[in-house]
Amino acid sequence: MEKLSRNNRVVIITKILVENPNKVIGLNRFSELLNAAKSTISEDIVIVREVLDKLDMGKVETISGAAGGIKFIPQMGSNAKEEFAKELCDALMEEGRIVPGNFIYLTDIMYNPQIISKAGVILASYFKSMDVDYVVTVETKGIPLAYEVAKSLGIELVIIRRENKVTEGPTVSINYLSGTSGRIQQMS
């Protein structure tokens, strides 16, 4: 592979980090992929780190040791969070959102990738310092948000269903007392 310019390397490093949040990526991977020395890659990473930090888009952390490397931790600055909260509140206050039963219609919001990806980054930021193994959600409406939180944390998503499907492999089932109906129900 031909030598790439610094701009090209910075773009590729940023793309790989953003597509793999909270995953440790060794410098060897970048060095081999970009056909550049580790010292050159380290200089490129400094640029990526500074720009993402300056724009409050995330942090690039260095992990020391044999299994070390760098990882990207997505984040939003406080101004961006406030703006997002305001936009979300405005959307929720739109006329016609109250449906029979005095519920708020949320489907269009819960399935909007631009909204849910931001909400996922914000929610994940509250768990970034914890040692979380999985993100768990109950099927259906919560899946997009739980997926985005799991993606931001770099961990797996577990979906709890009322009925298991044979194509999903091994399952664990529990009985629980429903808070709304007061009956014993089962979920897998």
Residue ranges and their predicted role:
Residues 2-188:
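PRPP-associated nucleotide enzymes
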